[in-house]
Amino acid sequence: MANTEAFFSQTLAERDPELFATITEEQERQETGIELIASENITSKAVLEAQGSVLTNKYAEGYPHRRYYGGCEAVDVTEQLAIDRAKKLFNCEFVNVQPHSGAQANGAVMLALLQPGDTIMGMSLSSGGHLTHGAAPAQSGKWFNAVQYEVSPETLLIDYDAIEAQALECKPKMIIAGGSAIPRQIDFKRFREIADKVGAYLFVDMAHIAGLVATGVHPSPLPHAHVVTTTTHKTLRGPRGGMILSNDLDLGKKINSAVFPGYQGGPLMHVIAGKAVAFGEALKPEFTDYIKQVVANAKALAEVMVERGCDIVTGGTDTHLMLVDLRPKGLKGNAADAALERAGITCNKNGIPFDTEKPMVTSGIRLGTPAATSRGFGIEEFQKVGHLISDVLDGLVEMPEGNPEVEARVLAEVRELCKRFPLYR
């Protein structure tokens, strides 16, 4: 008879010290550094607890009360709780919480509503779109006739008239709105008018702005879109995962079939539990306060970056993120990204609209405020962060291979700032 006592009692530190050391190292990195990657956030301890629960043991193919396995009573309640909370949060009629990621949510929508070879229109990566919106290397770019639209070369804003003209020409079956680097509000009503003119589905990917939509800080796409997807981390501050929403129950049936059995097998019930926790947190008044602070912090950070000699794409931000154009300083995104990381500040190199640099080089960086706001940073702290970033960039102008003296000083200041805002305790 095998001895199961150790299997059920040993901690991770005891059972796998090598992996435990790696996780401890990552926790230290998060604790002592400033996270400005716009697509990242910090979940609550309650979300972590749900994700680490015994629900990870349970297979639950199907949907609540329509499963292919027995023993699903508790997970049925869990999934229904996540669905009901999401419906309330976004004021919609249909929700599927099973997608493992935003990319899989997007893929399931396309599987539900399109046939291979259909024409789709999505924003190009260079203008701020996402890989899954028809970029050439992605499945959506290979399976469909993917037409990409750009922002205006003059204003760098979404040019709705140009998109309408393009749609009238190519007659897409689906128009995709949303992206990964759009700092301004999106006019979903105008997008729906364009879609209706050509008989297309309007599909909105609100992964980046879901928290803003949930709190009314950004207009909701749900009154206008046929279908909406989102991730559940980013500004929603939940576990990494995806979700599909709609007010069309007939489309909802197609989407459910596309998610399972079409695109995925068993749902990750421990992650869905984490989603339920996060949606419950987002329904509380303090989450609205948090999102308002995220946006205020982004505006404050953008103002400092401009004051210190950078350009902000579109001149500012209405959301949680901004694109910093480094060309006025003669810098490249990859060098800035690396220098900032050496100084304890994590962001990502990012192309700017009509960038002439390669994707692994870029002319810009993307900055976001959700994660640092989650740990308690306010406007004063983000103004400080803006100056620290600018110090590193100016040091890089002086010494293009890296400025050890400036980076060491900024790193020390970052460490001191982070001590005031500890994470899990």
From Swiss-Prot:
MF (Gene Ontology): glycine hydroxymethyltransferase activity; pyridoxal phosphate binding
Positions carrying N6-(pyridoxal phosphate)lysine: K234
GO terms under biological process: glycine biosynthetic process from serine; tetrahydrofolate interconversion
EC number: 2.1.2.1
Main location: cytoplasm
Residues at the site labelled Plays an important role in substrate specificity: H233
NCBIfam families: PRK00011.1
SUPFAM superfamilies registered for this protein in UniProt: PLP-dependent transferases (SSF53383)
Pathway of action: One-carbon metabolism; tetrahydrofolate interconversion; Amino-acid biosynthesis; glycine biosynthesis; glycine from L-serine: step 1/1
Family designation: Belongs to the SHMT family.
A Pfam family the protein falls into: SHMT
Compartments, record wording: Cytoplasm
GO CC term (a single one): cytosol
CDD domains: SHMT (cd00378)
Gene it is expressed from: glyA
Lineage of producing organism: Bacteria, Pseudomonadati, Pseudomonadota, Gammaproteobacteria, Oceanospirillales
Designated name of the protein: Serine hydroxymethyltransferase
Residues making up the signal peptide according to the UniProt record: none
Function: Catalyzes the reversible interconversion of serine and glycine with tetrahydrofolate (THF) serving as the one-carbon carrier. This reaction serves as the major source of one-carbon groups required for the biosynthesis of purines, thymidylate, methionine, and other important biomolecules. Also exhibits THF-independent aldolase activity toward beta-hydroxyamino acids, producing glycine and aldehydes, via a retro-aldol mechanism.
Catalytic activity field: (6R)-5,10-methylene-5,6,7,8-tetrahydrofolate + glycine + H2O = (6S)-5,6,7,8-tetrahydrofolate + L-serine
Keywords assigned: Amino-acid biosynthesis, Cytoplasm, One-carbon metabolism, Pyridoxal phosphate, Transferase
Assembly behavior: Homodimer.
Residues binding (6S)-5,6,7,8-tetrahydrofolate: L125, G129, H130, L131
Keyword Cytoplasm listed: yes
Needed co-factor(s): pyridoxal 5'-phosphate
